[in-house]
Curated annotation (Swiss-Prot):
GO molecular function list: 5'-flap endonuclease activity; crossover junction DNA endonuclease activity; ds/ssDNA junction-specific dsDNA endonuclease activity; zinc ion binding
Name by which UniProt lists this protein: Structure-specific endonuclease subunit slx1
PROSITE patterns, A to Z: GIY_YIG
Subcellular location: Nucleus
Length: 273
């Protein structure tokens, strides 16, 4: 479920090296980069020791995180028009801490990612100062200690490590002779359906019906997928991203739809010094 894109900064004297990668386990990945355990990227060996300056989390799937990572590493090669308009981002030939922070802030405002509800955990004061100086979006950042990583990981599960298992059991129970709470038609498996994640609510709906309901509520006729909406039964506010995450089966996770124990390929990662 949890998968983040991180920015490393070298703590080596006189080094200005930075490094962008992705992982489901930031603490373990940092130990790998610093040579404490096997599996660190070869490209980061010369600039050890490293620290995690910040990471972005809240991605709907692992694939989404990997796509975001690639653009963050290669902003000059992006095909996103709203990102290409920022010459200070796409004209960079050599990555620095400033260019990485600036690119991240701009990306979060782009149409491709602004509706994902991504969050930035900042662990380094220098990154925080740059963020404020560049007047980047402040509603998505959180200044915290790297010791808080586990709580951030759990936040992307809905706050409970067993949350997904609970949701899967609930879906299995509700899917038996189910009726859509919106169109009132039968939900015939294996169609894609969504359930309210709250334990005391039995709302179940076709994904298309629920998306249309949320978009109508938001008076949004420009997008296909919503950000959030009100449950048709319990009237609580629901996050579309969490609804979709709760609907993914273990096989979806195995196929890479959700973060697993693997890391991003070294060929996709980039270090600049």
């Amino acid at each position: 479920m949890f998968y983040c894109c991180y920015l490393l900064v070298s703590e080596k004297a006189a080094s200005r090296s930075v490094y962008i990668g992705s992982t489901p386990d930031p603490a373990r990945r940092l130990r790998q980069h610093n040579g404490e355990i096997k599996g660190g990227a070869y490209k980061t060996k010369r600039s050890r020791p490293w620290k995690v300056a910040c990471f972005v989390h809240g991605f709907p799937t692992k694939i989404a995180a990997l796509q975001f990572e690639w653009v963050w590493q290669h902003p000059q090669s992006t095909r996103h028009d709203d990102l290409r308009q920022h010459s200070r981002v796409v004209s960079v030939k050599r990555q620095t801490l400033l260019s990485c922070v600036r690119a991240l802030g701009v990306m979060l405002c782009c149409e491709a990612w602004s509706r994902w509800g991504l969050r930035v955990a900042i662990f380094d004061d220098a990154v925080h100062r740059l963020w404020l100086k560049e007047r980047l979006p402040s509603n998505c950042i959180q200044l915290c200690s790297f010791d808080d990583v586990e709580s951030l990981r759990l936040a992307d599960y809905g706050g409970d490590a067993g949350w997904l298992d609970t949701q899967r059991k609930k879906r299995a129970q509700l899917s038996v002779q189910a009726q859509c709470s919106i169109c009132v038609r039968a939900i015939l498996l294996p169609c894609f359906f969504l359930c309210c994640p709250f334990p005391d609510c039995r709302m179940i709906a076709h994904s298309t019906c629920l998306a249309a309901s949320f978009l109508q509520e938001a008076q949004d006729d420009e997008h296909i997928l919503p950000i959030s909406g009100t449950c048709a039964r319990c009237k609580r506010l629901l996050s579309w991203k969490l609804l979709v995450q709760a609907s993914l089966s273990p096989s979806d996770e195995d196929n890479g739809a959700v973060g697993d124990t693997g890391e991003s390929d070294d060929n996709n990662e980039r270090e600049s010094s």
